[in-house]
């Protein structure tokens, strides 16, 4: 029998509001920091399937969230496509060769780099109760492309946007390649035990409306369609962070089952503008969770009330901050669990 999170993502408006938090497996947890120190680098932790499974389950064990999300990274896809991936202390991820300097067809795919991720999914699934939904995920093509082209994160994605304008056919080939690998990657996660999927388009907010249609909506629609044809029982959550008013078109045109809302969007606007009865996920500001206090309770209740008339998964507007106090997460859970329509 599906748990409350899966029921909600499938379109049921149930009395108990399910909750999980983006980056819930991470540095704010002392048990995570201990294991990370033991394993060394971030990528080593991701590829140690026992350790990655343990990290995925840690927040479930501590807080009893309704969903466990796979501990991994969106850049596993370009790593499998043949780029070298390094996480440097204080600098973030680096990919090479960057596609500003090398042709896409020069990359030699290493599909075996995906297999350990599937093993982690299976190991997590074996540890969860039926009530806890296991979510897999991938980065959406635009966001992944920004790293593949520039070789690292950037503030305004200047290099990637310029390439898309200068040579749209070459950039389309990059988007298409990422899309195809992502479909297979997500399929592997479902086959290993994932019950729902999230597409993270973390940098969608850097695009103008026409480019948003081409580089965000279109490839996400291809992925959602492929997954629904293969696995109609597995809901897909689309999260185009920073989309703003373009979120409404995203929700209507991509075919995702549920849509994630970031903290910059008024929940009352989202409740009014998004398709009726479409499951929504979000959208508490992570800084409120960091700060705690009466304002945390007030704003949490505001989100709960705004989405009371549709299926809603309580979450943050983006990932939990590493300095968030454990007691604030416990307080949030108490508020959400204690609230009733």
Swiss-Prot record:
Similarity section: Belongs to the uroporphyrinogen decarboxylase family.
Localization terms from the record: Cytoplasm
Subunit organization: Homodimer.
A Gene Ontology BP annotation from the UniProt entry: protoporphyrinogen IX biosynthetic process from glutamate
Functional description taken from the UniProt entry: Catalyzes the decarboxylation of four acetate groups of uroporphyrinogen-III to yield coproporphyrinogen-III.
Name of this protein: Uroporphyrinogen decarboxylase
Source organism, top-level taxon: Bacteria
PANTHER family: METHYLTETRAHYDROFOLATE:HOMOCYSTEINE METHYLTRANSFERASE RELATED (PTHR21091), UROPORPHYRINOGEN DECARBOXYLASE (PTHR21091:SF169)
Species: Novosphingobium aromaticivorans (strain ATCC 700278 / DSM 12444 / CCUG 56034 / CIP 105152 / NBRC 16084 / F199)
One CC-aspect GO term: cytosol
PROSITE patterns: UROD_1, UROD_2
Binding residue positions for substrate: 23-27, 73, 147, 202, 318
Recorded GO MF terms: uroporphyrinogen decarboxylase activity
Coiled coil: none
Gene: hemE
Keywords, ordered alphabetically: Cytoplasm, Decarboxylase, Lyase, Porphyrin biosynthesis
Listed EC numbers: 4.1.1.37
